[in-house]
Amino acid sequence: MNHLGMVLQIWEQHQFYANRKKCAFGQPQIAYLGHRHIISGEGVSADPAKLEAMVGWPEPKNTTELRGFLGLTGYYRRFVKNYGKIVRPLTELLKKNSLKWTEMAALAFKALKGAVTTLPVLALPDLKLPFVTRVGKWNWSCFITREQACCVSQPRVF
């Protein structure tokens, strides 16, 4: 609470005021970005209500429904390891004129729904510890990742 007092005092010095109706202090977790993320002491997690919507999504019957599903799941792609590989059969369907549902698309749809049921809690970075930057390439793509160089095995972001 001492830090909070210091912050509010500095705000007041610069004529910056907090709206009491919009403030919440001492909360174990808060909703962030329009209730799409939950931030707690453990890290950042997906909103359970959004996960229920993804799991309950029916098999798409047209490209509009498929785009809706991919839009919703795509928002959480940083939580899903190998998201691009999983959704590739589904994104391929968007390139054609009509939706021709295949067995591969059905498997990808089920795999993605399964992946969102077990989303990890992403750890918040510790800015006091160093980061490790890795650069690599795979097939036709390249990637750069930044990882926290510490003993915590909790993922930061995929």
UniProtKB/Swiss-Prot annotation:
Question: Which domain of life, per UniProt?
Answer: Eukaryota
Give the record's GO CC terms. mitochondrion
| Keyword Mitochondrion included in the entry's annotation | yes
Q: Principal localization?
A: mitochondrion
Q: According to its UniProt record, where is this protein located?
A: Mitochondrion
Q: Which InterPro entries match?
A: DNA/RNA_pol_sf, Rev_trsase/Diguanyl_cyclase, Viral_Replic_Matur_Polypro
User: Has keyword Ribosomal protein?
Assistant: no
Q: Which UniProt keywords apply?
A: Mitochondrion
Miscellaneous comment: A stretch of 270 kb of the mitochondrial genome is duplicated within the centromere of chromosome 2 resulting in the duplication of the gene. The expression of the duplicated gene (At2g07682) is not demonstrated.
Xref: PANTHER family: POL PROTEIN, RIBONUCLEASE H
UniProt-recorded name of the protein: Uncharacterized mitochondrial protein AtMg00860
The record lists the organism as Arabidopsis thaliana
